[in-house]
Amino acid sequence: MRILVSNDDGVDAAGIRMLASVLREAGHEVTVVAPDRDRSGASNSLTLDLPIRLKRIDHYTVSVAGTPTDCVHLALTGLLEFEPDIVVSGINNAANLGDDVIYSGTVSAAMEGRFLGLPAVAVSLVSRNHDPKHFETAARAAVEIVARLKADPLPADTILNVNVPDLPWNEVKGFEVTRLGNRHRAEGCIAQKDPRGNEVYWIGPAGREQDSGPGTDFHAVRTGHISITPIQVDLTRYQALEKVASWVGGLSAALDQPA
């Protein structure tokens, strides 16, 4: 298969290098289009106020001065001379579980691929303290998932968010289909002062696990399983439509009132 690989940790990150290498060893034609530096947390952002510069590192690798979404968007709308069969994003060097997907550049790169018409997979290694040990396990998982998608494609609107426990392959207990869990509210920002006495702030840590019981991505990884969560671009909360329609009725009544 022709595979477009991207990430949010940057084109030189260990995870993307391992992913591209193992996919090539499996016989796939791999092209890497990835940010020139770490763009974690960039979510679905596109660069619209500046031209996007790039560097062709070799015939199969392009470094982009932009976001993960920029990378996939450019690749699929004119940068590449061919249409890939699938987009695989990763391997992220930490979890993308539950609410993490809202902020994740790794997931957003996959989402952009799906938005532009291709099957898409986001792969993350759930390491401790951002100190990943077993990228080869996550890469092996990606190879198996890509092979399965080739043999038995999923519905066209499906994005697979894959989280892999940081274990040797022979210690992984299996694959598990999950839903997204969620976290408690994020911890507070961190206030400091720069050398000139000016206020500066750092975004604080993500919240702790909240909804993380059986069936969630958190639980699967915690019990040694590879979590596969199908997600989609449509963010509509369908179960709330009837309630909100009734609520909007109260707003509509205001139109009958004199100004």
UniProtKB/Swiss-Prot annotation:
Binding note for cofactor: Binds 1 divalent metal cation per subunit.
Q: What is its main location?
A: cytoplasm
Its protein name is: 5'-nucleotidase SurE
> Do you know which Pfam families this protein is assigned to?
SurE
This protein's source sits in the domain of life called Bacteria
- Cite the entry's keywords alphabetically: Cytoplasm, Hydrolase, Metal-binding, Nucleotide-binding
The protein's Enzyme Commission number: 3.1.3.5
What reactions does this protein catalyze?
A: a ribonucleoside 5'-phosphate + H2O = a ribonucleoside + phosphate
Gene for this chain: surE
Organism phylogeny: Bacteria, Pseudomonadati, Pseudomonadota, Gammaproteobacteria, Lysobacterales
Q: Which organism is it from?
A: Stenotrophomonas maltophilia (strain R551-3)
